[in-house]
Amino acid sequence: MTSGQEHYWQGEWIDEAEAERRLDQLDDFARDALARPLSALTVLSACDRLATALTDPANPFTGRLTKRMREDGFAGGEVTHTLREVAAALGREALETKLMRELGAIDPGRLARFDLRREVYEAWLPLGLLVHVAPGNAPAVGALSVIEGLLGGNVNVVKTSGSRRFTHDLLAELARHDQTGRIAERIVVLGFPSSRTAWLEQLCAAADGVAAWGGEEAIAGIAALVRTGCRLVDWGPKLSFAYLTADAWSSPQVLQGIAADVCRLDQQACSSPQVVYLDTHEENEVLAFAERLAAILAESVAASQPAQPSLLESAEITNTVLVTRLEEHLGLTRVHAADDGSWHVLADLRSALRASPLHRSVWVKPLPRERIGEVLRPMRHYLQTVGMGASRTDTAVLATAVLAAGAQRVTVPGQMLSSYNGEPHDGVYALQRYCRRVDAQLDGRFATDACLDDLVGARDLLPPPVQITPKAEFERLQGDVSRAEVFFRSGGSSGAPKLSAFTWDDYHEHMRWGAEGVLAAGFDPCGDRAMNLFFGGQLYGGFLSFFSVLEQLRAVQLPMAAQDDHAMVARAIVEHEVDTLFGMPNYLLRVFTEGEKELRRDGRVRKIFYGGEHFPQRQQVWLRREFGVEVIRSAAYGSVDAGPLGYQCSHSPARAHHLFSGLQTLEILDMEEDRPAAAGETGRLVFTAHTRRGQRLDRYEIGDLGRWMEGDCPCGRRTPRFELLGRFGDIFRSGSHFLNYRRFVSVAEEALDHHGAVQVLLDEDAGSERLTLRLEGDAGEQDAEVAKIFLDRYPQLSDAVVRDGLLRFDVEHARHDSFERTEASGKLLAVVDRRERNL
């Protein structure tokens, strides 16, 4: 910002004349910005980066902001406190909690079903243009209100006092931390005095909502400017007090807590105590307490750096103290004051609630508990915080009484100005006042659509500017799991099993996305009768996850889990009239094989939703032909470490998936370099989970290969589509050649009509390598002839075995239970490498 450029407008610093010109077109600016939706996830990322900068004293921006605040007249202690409070409020955890508490979701703008059994969609959408008339005595309030407006997706114009630039600088820096540019186009900061009514009138005329702070007269003046239909969010004057019973008012700790609350922010906060009430009828107890409090307050003020009141504020303090001293002659009051006027304790034997002149001036009054309602209820519209000093039993009784009389918050002495993430403000949730709840009630054409946004386009969520983390280095992402509450272990099919960390919010959110994916795949929560046959136990998440997915869908579920007695499971399917199965392909095939007679005769199973491994096409054909199964689709594409990643719709080919674009960002990168793979080419899948709380998952290389699919899907969704093309582990080096497990599977299916398990075993002896291909079937079944078929149909294998003589190749047939599987999930291990260098 250069000299004369005093205002911040959508990413630019402008002067008075330009601001005047743009104000005439404010509605046009707002309309253009609102046409490009802003996800709360984008705001979260930018705020978290800014919070990190504010906690670093060496950060250049933090240094500039500190200097600016001191130049604006803020005391050193207040500067430090303000920056600390702002950093805490902008942290990812604080804002995530706020969104969940106030709007019920971390991305509340999704127009999604609240009940997955009905075609009814709801979302929290922005009011539109939100004007914030910020107070001059609290530097952070305006900026934090704008951030709440951004979380709701609004275009925000904040009016600050004419001289101070804290809000300008902080919000401009926030916009700089956003890679998309969407935040900048939703922020305007104008610094001008309240006497400039023409600008304020223009702002209010264009506004869809106005948030205002100030006294009654100021709020009334703004209300007169607000047009019909515009929402006025009134953060008007509030009054807070402490209330002490006899067993608390003699405690030095309680008095020290009250003194600390009086001194914090020079008593400028709405939650600062202006009165201390005592639960007594005795005048002497009031006067004695005031004397003790004065001594403690004097010590607290001496240890702080109090700001000096303005000329008008000093005049109000002087007038109040003078009148109170005069009333001493009537036996009504007693004044205790510092010689330099830095603090005042004003004892008053009348119970009526009244505001103090602030700047460490506090009333002490009697208020017997039986009179709480009588005295406080007439002032109910002004009451905010009560610092309750009482026994455990009395606290419960008295808290109920003051809340019934109109108070909004009850805390303890010393904590009156403290808060917690997601706390209501003045009895309401701010985010709900900055948003509007909308709904769409549709029909059966949308039976498989969980979110209407997917029919419009994908969320524009960019990956963070960090290095890629390979799957083998997953533990690097677990440097901070302090928020983790739930742990699951991977099945181990792609390496050593490892624990993944989640919060409960992560878990429930992932299950919601999983349920949306199953709905898109064709599951009918109102009509289908499902049996969950995934593996469970040993920290494995398969069974438990799909139990919760079906719970989210509120579907009929029989949670059988995978059992060793496949025939028993088949009988249970028939007995309980199950028509839909969830499980892993190899396990489900064993159930159909061993329960073939019952299942074929019953013919009730119509849908299969699978996960964990590939379902060969030949085996799908067998199930459709022999058992009448109509739908066989992936229940979800995901992993224990990364969560849900993609889903299939009714038009998806076998390996094709839509991206969960509101949850993940996918990059498909070149096989050798960290750059995007060429169009249509196979690349490495790298995911960023934007809402993960238990551990961050930024640019994580999952270990799978795939390619982007071009064109729009016939299902109508506009979310990105990709095709899975195997795993890194499917490609292995043997006999100096790179071979692919998927090629062995393809040859088995196409040339041998094989629809059982396929496994590659690698070992070595006497310096030579051996590759054994294990096929499910009767032992010794034409192994040599089958080996020749593979050599004929797989040229790279033939080169290694026949031409170069570097590899021995054998085929063996084995029973189903001879195949090596992961201990936790029972998933088939595609490649088992026993070579010495891999042990």
Regions found by a protein language model. Give the residues of each.
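Nucleotide 5′-phosphate-binding alpha/beta core
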Residues: 1-130, 436-489, 495-521, 525-527, ...
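Hydrophobic alpha-helical segments in the ANL/AMP-binding
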Residues: 87, 141-151, 171-172, 519, ...
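Short, compositionally biased "basic patch" segments
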Residues: 335-349, 478-497, 510, 515-519, ...
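Active-site glycine/GP-rich loop and adjacent strand/helix microenvironment
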Residues: 1-36, 41, 45, 202-204, ...
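Short, well-ordered beta-strand segments
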Residues: 131, 528-533, 686, 774
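Rossmann-like NAD(P) dinucleotide-binding subdomain of oxidoreductase/dehydrogenase enzymes
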Residues: 110-263
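AMP-binding/adenylate-forming
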Residues: 504-516, 520, 529-589
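Nucleotide donor/acceptor-binding cores
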Residues: 128, 527-528, 606, 683
